[in-house]
């Protein structure tokens, strides 16, 4: 876990998110407290639980992005779920335990990728040996009338007597070393070979069992593993394609999945972050019928997971006591007080995110590392087109986005994507594979010429069904 101070965490978040200082401070403190807790004696660690956060603010102000960037910053298991997707036990829909199962899957993927990175060089060497064995089999694996592989590959006649070739291991090694150099130089990438691979098509019964096992948290593959033996089949493919397939097989052999699962469950329990979006949509007692049915029930189902319980997954039991939960909602109609009191108590840190202003929009267009204007500049560079956004163009885009948000639904910073896409549409369509580099300057006049139809007829949408 990265030993970042709260100030360092906020500075990292500032690279991607404009404004919302209090929200960034709160998540930074929550993250640092995990590091502080890890330094305490074991018995005291168990007593300290994370202070879950409830973010309140309209759509498009950065709630989800703050949580997502936070998880990436420390390489922590992270999952985003929609509260509206869950239903009370007994109704059709996803049960709330699935968010923990999803977190474990994410943690396993994270840990496995780290193990793969550590074993990358070893796996590449093993794959290289396997490809050479296919190109030049061992003598006992050869069929009668086998030809010198150099003759098969390059049309060169054999320089050794057949008898000597079939019985001399030194000669085989020499040939393989010569081919190894050609493999590494990329000369043989398009050569077609026959590879024995695992059949990835599962029988229908196994597919059904897989779906059920995910929902029940039971691994039927472990229970009935002998009923589903892995099938092999021979497949022709280029060496380039074979390398990817064989690398995956070698990783599966090299990586101890028991160790991966053990580490993944530990990370999910100690460092996992679950982001529950649209929590305001399940607030309120409702009428108990129609669409309101099970709203309070979902809250009561979420409650034990947030306050700490054990969820059974197909990889084993997972404790949720130290998972950090970040909930978010616009709360336009419902209020935070409409959540059941017990659930409110499990989110002691309530942060209000303010709506974005025109000045914020201008910063969003230019300051973040992943600003949409920067993305388009880099995209069009690949076509030989150098895009420049003038300062008055940035100001115009921000004004237009604010205007449209006022006239219709306010979707926050997401409106900037709509406006910029409209501005860039013709350029993206017309300029492809230009013969020589060209410069395109986007100014205020160009912006207004492209978006004029978006800001006129402001009341027209009320007549559209």
Swiss-Prot record:
A Pfam family matched in the record: AAA_2
Recorded superkingdom: Bacteria
Statement: the UniProt record of this protein carries the keyword DNA damage: no
Record's keyword terms, sorted: ATP-binding, Chaperone, Cytoplasm, Nucleotide-binding, Stress response
Subcellular location: Cytoplasm
InterPro entries for the chain: AAA+_ATPase (IPR003593), ATP-dep_Clp_protease_ClpX (IPR050052), ATPase_AAA_core (IPR003959), ATPase_dyneun-rel_AAA (IPR011704), Clp_ATPase_C (IPR019489), HslU (IPR004491), P-loop_NTPase (IPR027417)
GO CC annotations, alphabetized: HslUV protease complex
SMART domains: AAA (SM00382), ClpB_D2-small (SM01086)
Gene3D superfamilies from the UniProt entry: 1.10.8.60, DNA helicase RuvA subunit, C-terminal domain, P-loop containing nucleotide triphosphate hydrolases
Binding site residues for ATP: 18, 60-65, 277, 342, 414
Molecular functions per Gene Ontology: ATP binding; ATP hydrolysis activity; peptidase activity; proteasome-activating activity
GO annotation terms (biological process): protein unfolding; proteolysis involved in protein catabolic process
Family: Belongs to the ClpX chaperone family. HslU subfamily.
Record's subunit section: A double ring-shaped homohexamer of HslV is capped on each side by a ring-shaped HslU homohexamer. The assembly of the HslU/HslV complex is dependent on binding of ATP.
Entry function: ATPase subunit of a proteasome-like degradation complex; this subunit has chaperone activity. The binding of ATP and its subsequent hydrolysis by HslU are essential for unfolding of protein substrates subsequently hydrolyzed by HslV. HslU recognizes the N-terminal part of its protein substrates and unfolds these before they are guided to HslV for hydrolysis.
Protein name: ATP-dependent protease ATPase subunit HslU
Originating organism: Caldicellulosiruptor saccharolyticus (strain ATCC 43494 / DSM 8903 / Tp8T 6331)
């Amino acid at each position: 876990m990265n030993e970042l101070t709260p100030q360092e965490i906020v500075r990292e978040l500032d690279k991607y998110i404009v404004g919302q200082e209090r929200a960034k401070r709160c998540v930074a403190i929550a993250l640092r407290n995990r590091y502080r807790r890890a330094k305490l004696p074991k018995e005291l660690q168990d007593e300290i639980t994370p202070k879950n956060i409830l973010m309140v603010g309209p759509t498009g102000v950065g709630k989800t992005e703050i949580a997502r960037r936070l998880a990436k910053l420390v390489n922590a298991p992270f999952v985003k779920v929609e509260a509206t997707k869950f239903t009370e036990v007994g109704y059709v829909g996803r049960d709330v335990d699935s968010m923990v199962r999803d977190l474990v899957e994410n943690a396993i993927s994270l840990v496995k990728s780290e193990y793969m990175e550590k074993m990358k060089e070893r796996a590449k060497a093993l794959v290289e040996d396997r490809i050479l064995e296919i190109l030049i089999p061992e003598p006992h694996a050869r069929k009668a009338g086998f030809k010198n592989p150099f003759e098969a590959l390059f049309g060169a006649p054999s320089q050794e007597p057949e008898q000597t070739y079939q019985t001399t291991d030194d000669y085989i090694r020499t040939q393989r070393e010569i081919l190894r150099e050609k493999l590494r130089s990329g000369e043989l990438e398009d050569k077609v070979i026959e590879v024995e691979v695992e059949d990835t098509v599962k029988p229908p019964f196994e597919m059904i069992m897989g779906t059920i096992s995910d929902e029940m948290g039971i691994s039927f593959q472990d229970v009935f593993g002998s009923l589903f033996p892995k099938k092999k089949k021979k497949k022709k493919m280029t060496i380039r394609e074979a390398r990817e397939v064989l690398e995956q097989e070698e990783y599966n052999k090299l990586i101890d999945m028991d160790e991966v699962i053990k580490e993944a469950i530990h990370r999910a329990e100690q460092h996992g972050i679950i982001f529950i979006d649209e929590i305001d949509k399940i607030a309120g007692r409702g009428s108990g019928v129609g669409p309101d049915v099970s709203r309070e029930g979902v809250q009561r189902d979420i409650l034990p997971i947030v306050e700490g319980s054990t969820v059974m997954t197909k990889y084993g039991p997972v404790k949720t006591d130290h998972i950090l939960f970040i909930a978010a909602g616009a709360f336009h109609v419902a209020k935070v007080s409409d959540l059941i009191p017990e659930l409110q108590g499990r989110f002691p840190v309530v942060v209000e995110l303010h709506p974005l202003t025109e000045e914020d929009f201008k910063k969003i267009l230019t300051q973040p590392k992943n600003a949409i204007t920067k993305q388009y500049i880099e995209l069009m560079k690949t076509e030989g087109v150098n895009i420049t956004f003038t300062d008055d163009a940035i100001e115009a885009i921000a004004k237009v986005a604010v205007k449209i948000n006022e006239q219709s639904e306010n979707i926050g910073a997401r409106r900037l994507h709509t406006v910029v896409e409209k501005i860039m549409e013709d350029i993206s369509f017309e300029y492809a594979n230009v013969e020589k580099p060209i410069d395109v300057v986007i100014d205020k006049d160009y912006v207004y010429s492209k978006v004029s139809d978006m800001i006129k007829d402001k009341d027209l949408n009320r007549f559209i069904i």
